[in-house]
Amino acid sequence: MTTLTHRARRTEISKNSEKKMESEEDSNWEKSPDNEDSGDSKDIRLTLMEEVLLLGLKDKEGYTSFWNDCISSGLRGGILIELAMRGRIYLEPPTMRKKRLLDRKVLLKSDSPTGDVLLDETLKHIKATEPTETVQTWIELLTGETWNPFKLQYQLRNVRERIAKNLVEKGILTTEKQNFLLFDMTTHPVTNTTEKQRLVKKLQDSVLERWVNDPQRMDKRTLALLVLAHSSDVLENVFSSLTDDKYDVAMNRAKDLVELDPEVEGTKPSATEMIWAVLAAFNKS
């Protein structure tokens, strides 16, 4: 009986320890310098997906460019990075047969809810999937780009609209109906331009005034956002307000950053592997 009691206590301590780690990871995300704003936006916390969509939206029109066919997969990549940064998923450790980022499978670390519907829906898919899948495969599955009819169940639907509704609830966007000749479309114009400008300036500064020329020394969420903005084809929107000289510098530095070898960067001591795995997936696609 004593042994069983001790074993039960050890199990309880282990579970409590895991919950504490998850709580600390979520707390660290909330307290990240990247999530601390000034002025009116000090209480606003945005996910990477929300930031990418906000950067891609036309302020007054409230929709993304009709010619942008990259943002859907970019948002799915953002979901994977967000889950990894919150301690919910990770890449399996490298082995002799699986050294490359794109060969290694995405594993579940914790199925504890994040409070975000899209993140939690993805988490359920990852938990329920056997055998496990790679980062590139997950981006394809979540986007619905699969020829396997049995895997269409993993597609996340209405992602842009759901993210936009989150931004409406956070007071950054509003909802309107616009008529486009033959059909009506729901749009989400930006109402909190201060928050969007803060986001734009943060990215501009990261490749100009605060440029460190080393991704390992960059704030991880800023690095992730630069990678996702590039992969989602919205980086042009970020730098469009700069003078010609600064625009050229910013674009060249961002280009140098995303052209680094993900396999090399992902093995460095302080690297967040999921960021580089997502970049590698987009570079290959």
Swiss-Prot record:
Compositionally skewed regions (Basic and acidic residues) per UniProt: 10-42
Location(s) in or outside the cell: Golgi apparatus, Golgi stack membrane; Golgi apparatus, trans-Golgi network membrane
GO molecular function: cargo adaptor activity; phosphatidylinositol-4-phosphate binding
Membrane topology qualifier: Peripheral membrane protein
Ranges for region Disordered: 1-42
Keywords: Golgi apparatus, Lipid-binding, Membrane, Phosphoprotein
List of residues binding a 1,2-diacyl-sn-glycero-3-phospho-(1D-myo-inositol 4-phosphate): W67, R76, R157, R160
Major location (coarse): Golgi
One GO CC term, this protein: trans-Golgi network
GO process terms (BP): Golgi organization; Golgi to plasma membrane protein transport; Golgi vesicle budding; positive regulation of protein secretion; protein targeting to Golgi apparatus; retrograde vesicle-mediated transport, Golgi to endoplasmic reticulum
The keyword Membrane belongs to this UniProt entry's keyword annotation: yes
Annotated spans, Beta-hairpin required for oligomerization: 176-187
Modified residues (Phosphoserine): S112
Keyword Nucleotidyltransferase: no
Function recorded in the entry: Phosphatidylinositol-4-phosphate-binding protein that may antagonize the action of GOLPH3 which is required for the process of vesicle budding at the Golgi and anterograde transport to the plasma membrane.
Record text on subunit structure and interactions: Homooligomer. Does not interact MYO18; differs from GOLPH3 by its inability to interact with MYO18. May interact with ARF1.
Family: Belongs to the GOLPH3/VPS74 family.
Protein name: Golgi phosphoprotein 3-like
Organism whose genome encodes this protein: Homo sapiens (Human)
Gene that this sequence comes from: GOLPH3L
